[in-house]
Structure formats: C-alpha cells, structure tokens
Curated annotation (Swiss-Prot):
InterPro entries: Conjugal_tfr_TrbD (IPR016704), T4SS_VirB3/TrbD/AvhB (IPR007792). The lineage of its organism: Bacteria, Pseudomonadati, Pseudomonadota, Alphaproteobacteria, Hyphomicrobiales. It holds the Pfam family VirB3. This is Conjugal transfer protein TrbD. It is a single-pass membrane protein. The gene is trbD. Coiled coil: none annotated. The chain crosses the membrane at residues 40-60. It is found in: Cell membrane. It comes from Rhizobium radiobacter. Its main location: membrane. One of its GO terms (cellular component) is plasma membrane. Belongs to the TrbD family.
C-alpha cells in the first residue's frame, strides 16, 4: 500500500469515461434502432392500430433490452464478438481430451 507521503502519481478517471453508453437503461444503439422501426411502422401504415401496435412492441423490446443491460451492459458487443469468433472456437471438445 502506498503511504500518504509517497511520490506516487495519481490520475483521476472520470466516471463518464468508463461507463457504458446507455439510453433509458438499455444499449443506446438498440433502443434507437427499435424506435426507428416502430416509427417507420407507424408512419407507413398510418392507422391507430399500427400506432398502438408500434408503441406496444417498442415498449416490450425496450423492457427486454433493459433486462439485458442489467445483466451485462456490454452484452451486445460480447455477442457480436462471439459471432465473429464462432469459426475459430467450436462448442465441441477436442479429440485429445481423453489423453
């Protein structure tokens, strides 16, 4: 442990620089993408039923995204990385496991 009189250099890391980028408690890009899809549905169909359906679907998806972000705020990035590495790391064990 460093003593109070030591010459260690300390740097402040601001909380905003290390926090994940969330909007309404969910991943920002996914919330905006689902909002865009709901708005497109509402303005293309132009009925009250489409408006209610679009808002309901958006609220359900945002709830699911908030649950996902509560488990891991970076889950979208982890999943995209998992998909890109899927060819290199198989889900099966190696044939040399028994040795």
């Amino acid at each position: 442990m460093a003593e109070s009189g030591s010459a260690l250099v300390r740097s402040r890391v601001h909380r905003a620089l290390s926090r994940p980028n969330l909007l309404m408690g969910a991943d920002r890009e996914l919330v905006l993408l689902t909002a865009l899809a709901a708005i497109i549905l509402i303005f293309v169909v132009l009925t009250w039923y489409a408006a209610l359906f679009g808002i309901a679907i958006w609220l359900i998806v945002v709830g699911a995204l908030r649950t996902m972000a509560k488990a891991d705020p970076l889950m979208r990035r982890v999943y995209i990385r998992h998909i890109s590495y899927k060819n290199f790391y198989r889900a099966t064990s190696s044939p040399w496991r028994k040795f």
